[in-house]
C-alpha cells in the first residue's frame, strides 16, 4: 500500500514538474532556445550516446511510413492546436496593430480632463480659439494653425456580410482635417463640401458596409447624405465616414465638440503645446499624442483575445498530448521486440529515450509547420470588424507575424516533448527478456 501511494506521489510530482517545464519552455525567447538547440545538436554529433541516439532515431523514422495512420494523429492534432492558437492571437495582434498605426507622435488629441475616450468627452466651442493660439502648433502656408475640432456620431448601417444593422462611426471634422491627419489620403472622388450633407468613406468601411459606393445616397439622422469620395489611411480611420463637423452638429443637434486633433511642430512642438495647455487655468483638458491615445484603446480587447486564445489552445493541447501519448505508447508496444533487440546489442537507456523523443518531436514539428502554414494561408490579411471603444465597428486585418508562428512551433514542440517522454521512459525500462518474448 505504501509503495502504491509512493508511486502515485512520484507520478503526480512528475506531472507538476513537467507542466512547469512546459510553461517555461513556451515562455522562452528564441534567443535562448537557439543556444539550447545548438547544444543538443553538438551532443548528438560529438558524444557516443548522441550518435547512438541518432542511429536509433533513424531506424524509428524509417518505419514511419508503415505506421503513418497512427503517426498522423500526432501531426493533425498538433496542427489543429497551432492553427487555432495562431489564428486567435493573430486577431488580437491585427486589431492592436491597426490602432498602433493610427496617428503619430507629432499629432495631438485633446479631450476633456479625465476622459478616457471621445465618447465621454465634451469640449465647448469657446475653447477652440484658445487652443488654436497655444504655442507649438504647426501652421499652413497662410499661417493658420493646423487643428481639427471633431465629433463622432454612431450610426446604424447594414453589414455587407449578412445585412444586419451594425454600428458605424460618422466623424465630423474641421476644414484643416486633411492637413492634420496626414495618413488619410483621398483615393476616389473628392473631398466633401462644408455645409453640404456629403460624406467621404474609409476604404475599410466601404468593404464592410452596404450602400457606401461612390455616388450612393444614404439616410442618416433622417437626412439624405451623398457619398462623394473614398479615402485610405491604413489605420483605425479606415473604418469611419467623414463629413463636415458643423453639418453633422446641425443634423444631430450637437452643441459641442468631443475632441480636437492638432498637428504640432514635431516632438518638441508637442511638448511645448502640452506644457502651455497645462499652464492655462481656463483649459481643463487632457492632451496626448494620437499614437499613444489609439494604442491604449485596444489594450483590453487585445488582452482578452490573447487570454481566450491561450486558454482554448491549452485545452486543445491537452487533447493533442493524449493523442500523442496514445500513439507513442502503441508504437512502443508494437516495436517492443525491436527496442529490446537494440538494447541487447548495446543501445543503453538514454539513446533509446532520445531516439523516441526525436521521433515524436519530428512529428510535432511537422504538425506545427502544417498548422502555422494553414493559419498563415487562411487568416493572414483576412479582414473583419469588431466593436471598438467608441461603440462602433473597427475594421482590421488578421496579422500572422513571424513571432506568432514561432510561438506556435514552441507549443508544437512542447506537446511533442510531453507526448513522447513517458512512452520513451517506458521503453527504456521494459525488461529485455520480457520484450523479446512478445510477439
Indicate where each model-derived feature is located.
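Hydrophobic, regular-secondary-structure patches
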Residues: 79-169, 188-190, 195, 250, ...
Amino acid at each position: 500500500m505504501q509503495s502504491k501511494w509512493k508511486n502515485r506521489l512520484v507520478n503526480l510530482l512528475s506531472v507538476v514538474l513537467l507542466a512547469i517545464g512546459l510553461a517555461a519552455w513556451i515562455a522562452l525567447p528564441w534567443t535562448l532556445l537557439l543556444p539550447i538547440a545548438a547544444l543538443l545538436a553538438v551532443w548528438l554529433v560529438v558524444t557516443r550516446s548522441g550518435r547512438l541516439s541518432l542511429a536509433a532515431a533513424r531506424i524509428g523514422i524509417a518505419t514511419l511510413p508503415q505506421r503513418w495512420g497512427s503517426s498522423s494523429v500526432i501531426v493533425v492534432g498538433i496542427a489543429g492546436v497551432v492553427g487555432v492558437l495562431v489564428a486567435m492571437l493573430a486577431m488580437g495582434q491585427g486589431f492592436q496593430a491597426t490602432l498602433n498605426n493610427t496617428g503619430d507622435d507629432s499629432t495631438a488629441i485633446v479631450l476633456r480632463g479625465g476622459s478616457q475616450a471621445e465618447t465621454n468627452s465634451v469640449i465647448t466651442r469657446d475653447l477652440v480659439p484658445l487652443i488654436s493660439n497655444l504655442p507649438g502648433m504647426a501652421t499652413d502656408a497662410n499661417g493658420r494653425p493646423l487643428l481639427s475640432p471633431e465629433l463622432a456620431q454612431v450610426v446604424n448601417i447594414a453589414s455587407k456580410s449578412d445585412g444586419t444593422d451594425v454600428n458605424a462611426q460618422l466623424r465630423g471634422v474641421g476644414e484643416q482635417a486633411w492637413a492634420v491627419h496626414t495618413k488619410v489620403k483621398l483615393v476616389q472622388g473628392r473631398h466633401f463640401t462644408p455645409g453640404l450633407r456629403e460624406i467621404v468613406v474609409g476604404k475599410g468601411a466601404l468593404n464592410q458596409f452596404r450602400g457606401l459606393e461612390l455616388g450612393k445616397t444614404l439616410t442618416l439622422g433622417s437626412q439624405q447624405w451623398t457619398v462623394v469620395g473614398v479615402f485610405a489611411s491604413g489605420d483605425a480611420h479606415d473604418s469611419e465616414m467623414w463629413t463636415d463637423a458643423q453639418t453633422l452638429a446641425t443634423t444631430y443637434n450637437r452643441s459641442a465638440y468631443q475632441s480636437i486633433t492638432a498637428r504640432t511642430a514635431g516632438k518638441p512642438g508637442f511638448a511645448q503645446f502640452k506644457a502651455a495647455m497645462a499652464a492655462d487655468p481656463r483649459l481643463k483638458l487632457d492632451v496626448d499624442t494620437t499614437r499613444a491615445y489609439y494604442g491604449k484603446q485596444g489594450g483590453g480587447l487585445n488582452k482578452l483575445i490573447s487570454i481566450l486564445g491561450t486558454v482554448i489552445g491549452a485545452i486543445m493541447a491537452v487533447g493533442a498530448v493524449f493523442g500523442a501519448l496514445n500513439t507513442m505508447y502503441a508504437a512502443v508496444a508494437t516495436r517492443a521486440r525491436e527496442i529490446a533487440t537494440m538494447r541487447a546489442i548495446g543501445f543503453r537507456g538514454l539513446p533509446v529515450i532520445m531516439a523516441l523523443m526525436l521521433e515524436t518531436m519530428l512529428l510535432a514539428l511537422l504538425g506545427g509547420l502544417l498548422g502555422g502554414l494553414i493559419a498563415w494561408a487562411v487568416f493572414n490579411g483576412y479582414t473583419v470588424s469588431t466593436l471598438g471603444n467608441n461603440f462602433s465597428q473597427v475594421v482590421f486585418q488578421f496579422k500572422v507575424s513571424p513571432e506568432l508562428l514561432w510561438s506556435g512551433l514552441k507549443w508544437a514542440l512542447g506537446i511533442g516533448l510531453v507526448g513522447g517522454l513517458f512512452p520513451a521512459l517506458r521503453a527504456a525500462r521494459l525488461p529485455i527478456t520480457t520484450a523479446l518474448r512478445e510477439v
